[in-house]
């Protein structure tokens, strides 16, 4: 049964190594209690996962994204970029205020932090959780 299922899955996921990763991830999800989308027919979890991929009840792209998300330790949060129209409006007001500022080179300034503020920030940090990776 599994051989026929794998041959059906190669049409959906061309790389057989990626197919193994996706099917094993899905089989682990099933063993953790995730609901299955097809009839089990007394098959084991890896065979059920392969049949789900072959029957296209699950998208391989969705499985791939879920696998990547499960392996990530640090998730980056995309912060919204400032609106270009508001930047132009703010820049236009500054240049209209005086012509002398336009000729002078623009000075780059950074936020200044005192040593006490830095130490208070460091003391407020929470140590990372211990993991078995080390």
Swiss-Prot record:
The RNAP catalytic core consists of 2 alpha, 1 beta, 1 beta' and 1 omega subunit. When a sigma factor is associated with the core the holoenzyme is formed, which can initiate transcription. This is DNA-directed RNA polymerase subunit omega. Residues 85-97 have a biased composition (Low complexity). Pfam families: RNA_pol_Rpb6. GO terms for biological process: DNA-templated transcription. Its EC number is 2.7.7.6. Promotes RNA polymerase assembly. Latches the N- and C-terminal regions of the beta' subunit thereby facilitating its interaction with the beta and alpha subunits. GO terms for cellular component: DNA-directed RNA polymerase complex. Residues 77-108 are annotated as: Disordered. The keyword DNA damage does not apply. It catalyses: RNA(n) + a ribonucleoside 5'-triphosphate = RNA(n+1) + diphosphate. Belongs to the RNA polymerase subunit omega family. It is an enzyme of class 2 (transferase). Keywords: DNA-directed RNA polymerase, Nucleotidyltransferase, Transcription, Transferase. GO terms for molecular function: DNA binding; DNA-directed RNA polymerase activity.
């Amino acid at each position: 049964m599994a051989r026929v299922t794998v041959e059906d899955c190669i049409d959906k996921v061309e790389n057989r190594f990626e197919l193994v990763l996706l099917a094993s991830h899905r089989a682990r999800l099933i063993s953790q209690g995730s609901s299955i989308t097809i009839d089990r027919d007394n098959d084991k979890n890896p065979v059920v996962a392969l049949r789900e991929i072959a029957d296209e009840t699950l998208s391989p792209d969705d499985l791939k994204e879920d696998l990547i998300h499960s392996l990530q330790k640090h998730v980056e949060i995309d912060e919204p970029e400032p609106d270009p129209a508001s930047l132009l409006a703010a820049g236009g007001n500054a240049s209209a205020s005086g012509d002398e500022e336009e000729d002078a080179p623009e000075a780059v300034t950074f936020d200044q932090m005192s040593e006490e503020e830095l130490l208070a920030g460091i003391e407020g940090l929470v140590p990372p959780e211990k993991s078995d990776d080390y």
